[in-house]
Structure formats: structure tokens, C-alpha cells
């Protein structure tokens, strides 16, 4: 099949709509269940490239959680700690595979943004991954294969209408790609830039101690950015993107947005948050929203008399601004990547507040000396990759 008819395009008024192969060849994917839409397939094909490249670059199973053609999260398949299992709502007795861990971590970083996500897996979807996904609100999934048990589990989602797409893992697109805007065709070479450890050798900071785990984190950050709407900045810890700032017009706003998301992720591990006692019948999305509000400056919205009883068994103590600041200050060893150069040292200053020790960015600003000096002030490791990663 070289074409797939869709219900509509980006919006219901945009008809007709389809995806097809210009050269008349067969589509490199098959729809195993459901009826994916235009934006679903944009998410699917962008997210597949991300996880495929992550797997190639790190040798680890990789997963992503996409919304509106940008990743809400991405991660490689490292084991979950007991705290991870608690904040990601994982059954302590569940048997987890590496690919399941990768998706749980990818989705867990920003659970509000991942509500109704598109999931992407570098490896075959197994029953462990499907079982976790079954209880989450999600629009669809793309993977190179599915076990029989996993497919049966996924087919029960959304009253049997959950979108399941299988991609040919060996498919390679043409070297040149096209896009029509206002009736005009744009042509460019596909972004086939390989991101690997060789890109991280130009360390321009005084501190040149870049351990292997930080190299993996830099690779995760850069590949995530390669498939994030620009401008974009990504914070990573232990192979997991913990904050993605996408589609901002200024670099510092990207750095702030991604940093705030990284802070929110870390605040969910605060002892007061871990001790929250939720009512027995609370839904996962309601629990996610409650945690998000509780850790924000709007905490009274869930703690007011007559309100907290809907969510908690016991009224929680306020997580004060001082407690939040002190907790975030304990975060260390974080990596930040940027899809274009940092024009000023203020980006480094903001990144430091979220525990950043390692920075990967292209370099090339007329103020590179100021950026380097700011990194040196805090003993950070700064690598200039020489590669811009804009994505539109």
C-alpha cells in the first residue's frame, strides 16, 4: 500500500488528507489497529527517528513520548529505582524489561504533557510495556514489532480503537526531502547528521572531566533536540530527558522552560510529595494534576478547605518555597543541551540552578568567551559540538 487516506489534516476543515509515497513504493509502516490521524502520524514518524537514533548511538533500548510533534520525554532503558517506581506509578511487583523501563522513564518525566501522547519504542513492544501503557491515557504507539500478547493488550485500549503502528526498522528515506508551504515546494537534504561520542571531543572549558555517563546524557539531549521544534533546550539525568523546552523564540526562555520542567520532575521526589496520601479511587490524571499544583505556587488550589478532601485522605502540609529551593539545590550531575549556541552566559547561570554540571551546545556565538567564562566560574564541563540542530 503506497497511500493511506486520513479523516482530515491538522484540523477538521482540512480535507482531503492522506499520506503517500511520491515514488509509488509501499509505505514503510502498517496500521495494526485503530485509525491514526494526520498529527498522530507526524508524531509517529518523528518519534521513531528519535528512538532509532538513540538506540544506535547508545546501544540501549530507547523510548519517547511525543505530543504535537515534539518530545515531552525521551529515555534509554536503565533500571528504575524504588523512587522512580513510586513517582511513575509502577506496581512494585511488576516485572519490567529494558524497553518497558525506557518508556516508563520517557513518559514519567512530564506526565501532564504526556497525557494523550504518542509512544515510540526502538525495540519490539512486549507485554511488560503494553501492560504499563494500558493504564495510561495515550493516542497511539509506533514500534518495529509487537509480541502477540502485547498486541492483544493494546487492542483493548480506547474501546478497541487504540492506534498501533508497526514500522519497517530497515526503511531509509530518500536523501532529499520536500515540504509544501503556501503552494511553494521547499527542498532540502534530510538531516542525517550522526550524533555520537565523536561530537563531544571539543571541550572548551577548564574542566575537561567528562565521564561516560555524562557522554550518554549529552547524546540523549542532542538526539532529543534533533527532533524537537526549535528553539529548544533539553536537560538530561541518567539517560532520561528530565526537561524539554520546545518552540520558544528566545534561547533563555527555552532554558528557563526546560529548567522549570526539570525542577518539577525533581520536586516529585521530595519526601513531602512521596508521602502524599491520595483517596483510593483517584484517577492517574487527577493525581498528576494534584501533584503538579501542590508543588507549584498555586498549592492552595488543592489544599483549601472543602477541596483537599476530594484528592487526599489527609490534608498535606504545604511544601514551602524555602523547602523547594533547598531541595532543588541538592540536584547535581545534570546535563543540558541546546539546539543552537548560547548567546549569553545567562543560560549557563539558569542551568546551574537546576543542577547542571555538563553542557553540550554548538558554539559559534560572538560571546562564546563569556559563555565559557560563566561555565568555568562553576566548574562545569562545556563541549562545543559544532552542529546546529534546528527542527521545523
Please report, for each region that a protein language model flagged, where it lies by residue.
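Active-site loops and adjacent core secondary-structure elements that bind or stabilize anionic groups
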Residues: 1-199, 214-232
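Conserved helix-loop functional segments at active or binding sites
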Residues: 53, 227, 264-268, 353, ...
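Flexible, glycine/charged-enriched surface loops at secondary-structure junctions
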Residues: 57-65, 164-167, 230-237, 267-278, ...
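A structural signal for short secondary-structure junctions
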Residues: 57-58, 111-114, 226-227, 328-331, ...
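Active-site-proximal loop/turn and secondary-structure-junction residues that shape catalytic pockets
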Residues: 70, 125, 237-240, 342, ...
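Glycine- and Gly-Pro-enriched alpha-helical subdomains that act as flexible
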Residues: 72-111, 242-344
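C-terminal binding/interaction regions
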Residues: 117, 121-122, 135-165, 170-172, ...
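Substrate-contacting helices/loops that form the catalytic groove of nucleic-acid
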Residues: 175-210, 268-280, 284-291, 301
